């Protein structure tokens, strides 16, 4: 098995390369907050020498309640993304939920994300593939790791092989997720880059009746465990005031802890990737 390298400007995304950080905020709450968070991430990752892609959503279409905040929408969201990209010279990733969003979003961002709940929607997969953008596929909570090959095949047959696979936890009874570390290793056998969404793996879906709960206190332990697998990247969201974030605050890393947090993740990644491979199957 060879590791596929996805090129993004000067960034190389691959399981055997230094990890890439996909991070930012869950949903765009305001232009000013997005700029503040992007600036913090850019400064910290530049200081630590970590390749970085800014992430935020313009619409959270799958909230628990119809009254929950969803975001500014695509038109306003893309304006904010363009300003972040030009101001900080950052590549961008965001998610799409409908076929008509794919082409205009791909004109602004570098990576478009297929949400976990929509990962089997063929029309959406084909529309995303046709943009020729890099695709980040969130593994559905209800799929086994080996079933990701079907989604990969759909993208390939639609003409796109610039694929990243993202683990975000698996359903474990009601209102709970667990992370199968061996499952991430199984996805790595595809050769495609695998990244770990340590933020949403902390969720307790529906745990607060009308919104998801989370286990922010375990953010460090979970991410360190994932990084020990030798992954292509880490997906982490942060907020200056997680308790008052408009979406997934219980899972968000406090923004002021970002540098200390990433320092540990980089140390784990550097150490693991310095080891020689051991084939224990023989």
UniProtKB/Swiss-Prot annotation:
PANTHER family: PHOSPHO-2-DEHYDRO-3-DEOXYHEPTONATE ALDOLASE (PTHR21057)
InterPro entries tied to this protein: Aldolase_TIM, DAHP1/KDSA, KDO8P_synthase
Lineage, uppermost ranks: Bacteria, Pseudomonadati, Pseudomonadota, Gammaproteobacteria, Alteromonadales
Catalytically driven reaction(s): D-arabinose 5-phosphate + phosphoenolpyruvate + H2O = 3-deoxy-alpha-D-manno-2-octulosonate-8-phosphate + phosphate
Subcellular localization, as worded in the UniProt entry: Cytoplasm
GO CC field: cytoplasm
Protein family membership: Belongs to the KdsA family.
Pfam families for the chain: DAHP_synth_1
Listed GO MF terms: 3-deoxy-8-phosphooctulonate synthase activity
Pathway: Carbohydrate biosynthesis; 3-deoxy-D-manno-octulosonate biosynthesis; 3-deoxy-D-manno-octulosonate from D-ribulose 5-phosphate: step 2/3; Bacterial outer membrane biogenesis; lipopolysaccharide biosynthesis
Keywords: Cytoplasm, Lipopolysaccharide biosynthesis, Transferase
Protein name: 2-dehydro-3-deoxyphosphooctonate aldolase
EC number of the protein: 2.5.1.55
Biological-process GO terms, alphabetical: keto-3-deoxy-D-manno-octulosonic acid biosynthetic process
HAMAP family in the record: KDO8P_synth
């Amino acid at each position: 098995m060879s590791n596929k390298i996805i090129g993004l400007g000067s960034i190389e995304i691959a399981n055997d390369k230094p990890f890439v950080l996909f991070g930012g905020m869950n949903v765009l709450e305001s232009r000013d907050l997005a700029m503040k968070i992007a600036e913090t991430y850019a400064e910290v990752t530049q200081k630590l020498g970590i390749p970085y892609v800014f992430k935020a959503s313009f619409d959270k279409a799958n909230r628990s309640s119809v009254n929950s905040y969803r975001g500014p929408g695509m038109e306003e969201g893309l304006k904010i993304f363009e300003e972040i990209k030009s101001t900080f010279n950052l590549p961008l990733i965001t998610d799409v939920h409908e076929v008509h969003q794919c082409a205009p979003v791909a004109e602004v961002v570098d990576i478009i994300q297929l949400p976990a709940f929509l990962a089997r929607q063929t029309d959406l997969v084909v529309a995303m593939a046709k943009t020729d953008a890099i695709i980040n596929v969130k593994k559905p909570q209800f799929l086994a790791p080996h079933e990701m090959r079907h989604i990969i095949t759909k993208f390939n047959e639609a003409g796109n092989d610039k694929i990243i696979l993202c683990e975000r936890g698996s359903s474990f009874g009601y209102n709970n997720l667990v992370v199968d570390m061996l499952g991430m290793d199984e996805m790595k056998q595809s050769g495609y880059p695998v990244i770990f969404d340590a933020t949403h793996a902390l969720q307790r879906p529906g745990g607060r009746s009308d919104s998801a709960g989370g286990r922010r206190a375990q953010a460090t332990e979970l991410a360190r465990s994932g990084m020990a697998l030798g992954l292509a990247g880490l997906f982490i969201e942060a907020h200056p005031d997680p308790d008052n974030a408009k979406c997934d605050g219980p899972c968000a890393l406090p923004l002021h802890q970002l540098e200390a947090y990433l320092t540990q993740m980089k140390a784990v990644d550097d150490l693991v990737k310095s080891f020689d491979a051991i084939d224990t199957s023989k």
